[in-house]
C-alpha cells in the first residue's frame, strides 16, 4: 500500500522469517558465531532461548543457510510437538533413511545409528535443529537425550541445537531432565534491542526493501517504537509497519511520534 510512496520494492517489516532481512546486529552475530564455532568443534548440544518475537526462527533459518552442505547434514524440525516415535521418524526422514514406516521404535534407532555412522564415515557432521523446543513433550525430551547417546569412540554422531522460549530453561531445570541439561555445552539468550540497535534494525530493513535516503523515522518516533515494542523485533515490525501506514495516510514522508 505505502511501498511506492516511500520508494520501497517490498514491505520492510513483514513478519515472515525472511533471512534477506536478517540485520547484522551484535547480538545476532554473537549468536551465529557461537553456533558456527561450537558446531565446527563438534560440541554437541546447544541451547538458544529468547522471548516470543526476538528472532529465534530467523536465526535458525540463517544457520541453515550458513552451514556448508558438504560438511554438514542438516535435519530441521519446525514443529516439535512429537511423540518419541514421531521424533525418530522425523529425524530419519530428514536424513533420508528408507523404509521407516515398517520399523518400530528400536528398529528406527538402529537404522538411525547406521545412517549416522555412514554420514560420519563420509566426513559429514549431522546437526539436528529444533525450533520452538519448549513444546517438546517430556517423553520426547528423553528420547532426544537417547539420540544424543549415539557416538563413536572419537565423536558424537549427532549434534543438536534447540531454539526455544524461556519456558525451555524452566523445563530443563527440573530434576528429571538433569542428564539432558548436563549435556548442554553452550547456551545463548537473545535479549531485546536497545534504542541504538533498534534504530539500526529499522534502517537496514528499510534499505533491504529498497529505501534510499534519510531515515524516515524521527528520533522521537524511534524512541516511541522501542518503548512500545519493548525492543522485541516482531513487535517493532508491527509498530513500524502501522506507523508507515499512518504517515502515508497523511501524505507525510517523515514518521514522527504521533504516527506511532
Over which residues does each language-model region extend?
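Walker A/P-loop nucleotide-binding motif
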Residues: 42-63, 80
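Central P-loop NTPase core of STAND/AAA+ ATPases
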Residues: 95-120
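A short, basic N-terminal segment
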Residues: 1-42
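Conserved NTP-binding/hydrolysis module of P-loop NTPases
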Residues: 8-13, 71-74, 82-101
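A short beta-strand-to-loop transition that corresponds to the Sensor-1 phosphate-sensing loop
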Residues: 51-52, 132, 162-167
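Helix-loop-helix "sensor" segment of P-loop NTPases
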Residues: 97-98, 118-122, 127, 152, ...
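Conserved Walker B catalytic segment
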Residues: 113-162, 175
Amino acid at each position: 500500500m505505502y511501498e511506492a510512496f516511500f520508494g520501497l520494492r517490498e514491505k520492510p517489516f513483514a513478519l515472515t522469517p525472511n533471512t534477506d532481512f536478517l540485520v547484522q546486529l551484535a547480538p545476532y552475530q554473537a549468536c551465529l558465531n557461537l553456533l558456527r564455532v561450537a558446531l565446527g568443534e563438534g560440541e554437541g548440544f546447544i541451547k538458544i532461548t529468547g522471548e516470543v518475537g526476538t528472532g529465534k526462527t530467523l536465526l535458525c533459518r540463517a544457520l541453515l543457510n550458513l552451514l556448508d552442505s558438504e560438511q554438514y547434514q542438516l535435519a530441521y524440525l519446525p514443529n516439535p510437538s512429537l511423540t518419541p516415535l514421531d521424533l525418530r521418524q522425523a529425524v530419519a526422514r530428514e536424513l533420508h533413511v528408507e523404509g521407516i514406516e515398517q520399523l518400530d521404535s528400536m528398529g528406527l534407532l538402529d537404522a538411525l545409528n547406521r545412517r549416522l555412522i555412514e554420514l560420519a564415515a563420509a566426513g559429514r557432521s549431522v546437526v539436528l535443529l529444533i525450533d520452538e523446543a519448549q513444546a517438546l513433550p517430556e517423553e520426547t525430551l528423553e528420547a532426544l537425550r537417547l539420540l544424543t547417546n549415539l557416538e563413536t569412540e572419537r565423536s558424537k554422531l549427532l549434534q543438536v541445537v534447540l531454539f526455544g522460549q524461556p519456558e525451555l530453561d524452566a523445563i530443563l531445570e527440573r530434576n528429571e531432565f538433569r542428564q539432558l541439561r548436563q549435556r548442554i555445552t553452550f547456551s545463548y539468550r537473545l535479549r531485546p534491542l536497545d534504542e541504538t540497535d533498534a534504530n539500526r534494525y529499522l534502517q537496514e530493513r528499510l534499505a533491504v526493501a529498497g529505501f534510499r535516503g534519510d531515515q524516515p523515522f524521527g528520533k522521537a518516533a524511534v524512541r516511541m517504537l522501542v518503548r512500545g515494542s519493548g525492543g522485541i523485533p516482531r513487535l517493532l515490525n508491527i509498530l513500524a509497519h502501522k506507523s508507515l501506514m499512518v504517515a502515508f495516510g497523511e501524505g507525510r514522508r517523515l514518521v514522527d511520534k504521533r504516527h506511532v
